[in-house]
Amino acid sequence: MARFQEFYKEKVVPGLIEKFGYKSVMEVPRITKITLNMGLGEAVADKKVIENAVGDLTKIAGQKPVVTKARKAIAGFKIRQGYPIGAMVTLRGRAMYEFLDRFVTVALPRVRDFRGVSGRAFDGRGNYNIGVKEQIIFPEIDYDKIDALRGLNISITTTAKTDDEAKALLASFKFPFRN
């Protein structure tokens, strides 16, 4: 069992039951999945960009990402339908908790001028989104072997009904909120 998964069962669940007064353990919000998405508009000109991004995401997530393709053509961006324009990977279960552990304890502290993550990035339904500007904050990425700095979006989906419940859940996982 992953370290954060054990931590969730032993510390987070009792803490949230006490804070919100849930009657059942099944009412306690939990993280269902974490989605990592990398949009690669520059992949239209160079096909190597997709390969390098897929390699980076594989190292970060520990599983192979899916290459996302354009749904429709956009002449202004020189994109045709079916062109590869991004990569995404969905993590669940053990891999999700392992990634969350690495992200909170190792990757976030490596961000330059880090003062905490925004507490306003919730969507109103208990899900949280974080934008990472550089993939080099992850220790799996070798700085000397990357071709370009790429950002990625990390979307954390929870079963929480409100943003307050989701924020309490993530805060109990030691998420460094600044507000």
UniProtKB/Swiss-Prot annotation:
UniProt key word Membrane: no
Lineage: superkingdom: Bacteria
Keyword set, alphabetical order: Ribonucleoprotein, Ribosomal protein, RNA-binding, rRNA-binding, tRNA-binding
GO molecular function: rRNA binding; structural constituent of ribosome; tRNA binding
One Gene Ontology CC term in the entry: ribosome
Pfam family, one: Ribosomal_L5_C
Gene Ontology terms: biological process: translation
Subunit-level organization: Part of the 50S ribosomal subunit; part of the 5S rRNA/L5/L18/L25 subcomplex. Contacts the 5S rRNA and the P site tRNA. Forms a bridge to the 30S subunit in the 70S ribosome.
Family: Belongs to the universal ribosomal protein uL5 family.
Function: This is one of the proteins that bind and probably mediate the attachment of the 5S RNA into the large ribosomal subunit, where it forms part of the central protuberance. In the 70S ribosome it contacts protein S13 of the 30S subunit (bridge B1b), connecting the 2 subunits; this bridge is implicated in subunit movement. Contacts the P site tRNA; the 5S rRNA and some of its associated proteins might help stabilize positioning of ribosome-bound tRNAs.
PANTHER family, alphabetized: 60S RIBOSOMAL PROTEIN L11-RELATED (PTHR11994)
Protein's name in the database: Large ribosomal subunit protein uL5
Organism encoding this protein: Burkholderia thailandensis (strain ATCC 700388 / DSM 13276 / CCUG 48851 / CIP 106301 / E264)
